[in-house]
A protein has these predicted regions:
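Acidic beta-strand-loop-alpha-helix segment within the catalytic core
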Residues: 119-201, 258, 263-268
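Solvent-exposed alpha-helices and their adjacent loops that cap or buttress functional pockets
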Residues: 61-62, 87-93, 101, 109-113, ...
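Oxyanion/phosphate-interacting regions
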Residues: 2-14, 21, 211-229, 233-271
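DPxDG-like acidic metal-binding loop motif
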Residues: 93-104, 108-128
Length: 271
């Protein structure tokens, strides 16, 4: 805390330094990572996730913001903290929407594998996309070269060719990350038929989505169906680093589809 003197020579009130919200949020994710870090390789993904949640929630209380969790650990009756609608921060300006995933990749952590991360995204109040009942969404994530080239409504072959053209490379030089799931069998086959290299991952698609926008990672595109909360957070991260993402909500059944339609969210349209 700094103290300045007035023109009379008398000390003025203490001058508090401006607080940088981005740096404060780094401390939040750092705390969550350190909390989960004690559980790396110990085979208990539930304990790892809880440690990350506890650490992130405690640190959020010190952040200078008036935040509301839009995407969190679930509804209030499902999660004791970081639930959807919970107020976080110390109540000071700015007013923001908050999306959190204290530990993205709980199984990766439990198994001692890489690419588990703690993530948080903030946006001006009322601007964070809320996916409603949608648990999953179709996603395509790319770097700056892919902006304007990809189309979630186009075929995988068309998107591989479009990205290759935008990056001035052969389709055989395009590397695509896909979650290893049965639902992706046709997608994987078409991507390979188009000439792309397919890197399969078991869990955690936020890290490779961000990697698609960073040079030297060996990732050109993330493709496929994954969690909607992770999709929103990935989109925020990609926007910050100059990449891009397109997505469509992917209802698991007719009941979920109707819930989305009732809330004004049409799964047939890009989110």
């Amino acid at each position: 805390m700094a103290v300045a003197e007035g023109s009379s020579g008398r000390p003025r009130a203490p001058v508090r330094p401006d607080r940088n919200l981005a740096l404060e949020l780094v401390r939040v994710t750092e705390s969550a990572s350190m909390g989960a870090g004690r559980w790396v390789g110990r085979g208990d993904k539930i304990a790892a996730d809880q440690a990350a949640v506890d650490a992130m929630r405690a640190m959020l209380d010190s952040v200078s913001m008036d935040g509301v969790v839009v995407i969190g650990e679930g509804e209030k009756d499902e999660a004791p903290m970081l639930y959807n609608g919970e107020s976080v921060g110390n109540g000071a300006a700015p007013e923001v929407d908050v999306a959190v995933d204290p530990l993205e990749g709980t199984r990766l952590t439990a198994l001692g594998q890489p690419n588990a991360i703690a993530v948080i995204a903030v946006a001006e109040r009322g601007t964070m996309f809320f996916p409603g009942a949608a648990v999953y969404m179709e996603k395509i994530a790319v770097g700056p070269e892919g902006l304007g080239a990809i189309d979630i409504n186009a075929s995988p072959t068309e998107n591989v060719n479009a990205l290759a053209k935008a990056k001035s490379v052969s389709p055989r030089q395009i590397s695509v990350v896909v979650l290893e799931r049965d639902r992706h069998e046709d997608l994987i086959g078409e991507l390979r038929q188009a000439g792309a290299k397919v890197n399969l991952i078991r869990d955690g698609d936020v890290a490779p989505a961000i990697a698609a926008a960073q040079g030297g990672t060996g990732v050109d595109m993330l493709y496929g169906i994954g969690g909607t909360p992770e999709g929103v957070i990935s989109a925020a991260a990609l926007k910050a680093v100059g990449g891009g993402m397109q997505g469509k909500l992917w209802p698991r059944n007719d009941e979920e589809r109707q819930q989305l339609l009732d809330n004004g969210l049409d799964p047939a349209h890009r989110a």
